[in-house]
């Protein structure tokens, strides 16, 4: 009996452990609305951040129906340390340290969409690039420093550290090519990323990603180039 219990616990442990193989040419698929399906990403750097860039692809048909979380980075002091969120009828919401700015767009995302969001504390300049095109730069949380030891979640919006999810904020669709740097990429570098290049991500590296899956999330070949 004890041996059977040990085997069961071992299988459960392996089913929930970090994937060490990376996600090259793959994507996470969230097939239905939920408040318990998500992916937790393990950061390579665990330190306060004075700047960052996050780039990723996402694909969903929710954009005309409701809002949804694209990227959620929480610390114990601030659950919206970084939040990328699509707000229906408004556009892209970009939050740092709990403060929010809106990037209005004329085209609603219906195809696989590439996003890059960058921010730096020294100037407070926040940038959002959509499919290789820059939005107008805006000011956000100048002088702020992001806390360390983050909980990084795909598929849900964290309303507390690592939890408090809501179905109506969940992503239904695909997300992939999530990379993060601890500095603001230049326009030339972002264009290179959009064209398929890379610049050795040092916070999150999709090719060497470690993560934990919870709930109904599947790993499938990516649907974008």
Curated annotation (Swiss-Prot):
Ca(2+) 1 binds at residues 80, 158-159. Pfam families: Pentaxin. The keyword Isomerase does not apply. Found in plasma. Gene3D superfamilies: 2.60.120.200. Residues 1-20 form the signal peptide. Belongs to the pentraxin family. Displays several functions associated with host defense: it promotes agglutination, bacterial capsular swelling, phagocytosis and complement fixation through its calcium-dependent binding to phosphorylcholine. Can interact with DNA and histones and may scavenge nuclear material released from damaged circulating cells. This is C-reactive protein. It comes from Oryctolagus cuniculus (Rabbit). The lineage of its organism: Eukaryota, Metazoa, Chordata, Craniata, Vertebrata. The gene is CRP.
């Amino acid at each position: 009996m004890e041996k059977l219990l040990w085997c069961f616990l071992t299988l459960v442990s392996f089913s929930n452990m970090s994937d060490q193989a990376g996600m090259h040419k793959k994507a996470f698929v969230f097939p239905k609305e939920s408040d318990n399906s998500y992916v937790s990403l393990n950061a390579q750097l665990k330190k306060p951040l004075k700047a960052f860039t996050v780039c990723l692809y996402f694909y969903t048909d929710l954009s005309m129906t409701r809002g949804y979380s694209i990227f959620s980075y929480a610390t114990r002091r601030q659950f919206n340390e970084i939040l990328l969120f699509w707000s229906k009828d408004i556009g892209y919401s970009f939050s740092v340290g709990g403060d929010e700015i809106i990037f209005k767009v004329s085209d609603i995302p219906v195809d696989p969409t590439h996003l890059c969001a960058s921010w730096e504390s020294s100037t407070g300049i926040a940038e959002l690039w959509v499919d290789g095109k820059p939005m107008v730069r805006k000011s956000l949380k100048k002088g702020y420093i992001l806390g360390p030891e983050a909980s990084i979640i795909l598929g849900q919006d964290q309303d507390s550290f690592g939890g408090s999810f809501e179905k109506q904020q969940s992503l239904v669709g695909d997300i992939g090519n999530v990379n993060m740097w601890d500095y603001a990429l230049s326009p030339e570098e972002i264009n290179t990323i959009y064209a398929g290049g890379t610049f050795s991500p040092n916070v999150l590296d999709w090719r060497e990603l470690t993560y934990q899956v919870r709930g109904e999330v599947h790993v499938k070949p990516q649907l974008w180039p």
